[in-house]
């Protein structure tokens, strides 16, 4: 009984309220949480492959760890790169 009364009176409660032009503009321009769908993980993974780039270890003295490591001098700094193990990347700081 209460739910029927509530259901019938709810639309009448809002009849006297008229939306202002600002409210209408906000409703049209500001996306609500309900209208914006969250990206699904399967779609995100399909669009962008996950590529992890290793950063440089910043050290005062750099050294080669294996035979594949090689030294490069750029921008006044010494860099160590490695073809076989990306963990060996270093930058002299």
Curated annotation (Swiss-Prot):
Which Pfam families does the entry mention? Ribosomal_L36 (PF00444)
The name on file for this protein is Large ribosomal subunit protein bL36m
- What is the primary gene name for this protein? RTC6
Q: In which broad location class does this protein mainly occur, judging by the first location in its UniProt entry?
A: mitochondrion
Gene Ontology CC terms, in alphabetical order: mitochondrial inner membrane; mitochondrial large ribosomal subunit
**HAMAP family per UniProt:** Ribosomal_bL36 (MF_00251)
The protein's job, in short, is:
Component of the mitochondrial ribosome (mitoribosome), a dedicated translation machinery responsible for the synthesis of mitochondrial genome-encoded proteins, including at least some of the essential transmembrane subunits of the mitochondrial respiratory chain. The mitoribosomes are attached to the mitochondrial inner membrane and translation products are cotranslationally integrated into the membrane. bL36m may be involved in a process influencing telomere capping.
State how it assembles: Component of the mitochondrial large ribosomal subunit (mt-LSU). Mature yeast 74S mitochondrial ribosomes consist of a small (37S) and a large (54S) subunit. The 37S small subunit contains a 15S ribosomal RNA (15S mt-rRNA) and 34 different proteins. The 54S large subunit contains a 21S rRNA (21S mt-rRNA) and 46 different proteins. bL36m has a zinc binding site.
């Amino acid at each position: 009984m209460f739910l029927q009364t509530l259901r019938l009176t709810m639309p009448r409660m809002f009849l006297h309220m008229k939306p202002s032009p600002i409210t209408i503009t906000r409703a049209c321009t500001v996306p609500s949480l309900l209208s914006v769908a969250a990206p699904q993980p399967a779609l995100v993974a399909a669009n962008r492959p996950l590529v992890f780039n290793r950063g440089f270890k910043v050290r005062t003295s750099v050294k080669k760890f294996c035979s594949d490591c090689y030294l490069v001098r750029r921008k006044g700094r010494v860099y160590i790169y490695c073809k076989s193990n990306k963990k060996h990347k270093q930058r002299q700081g």
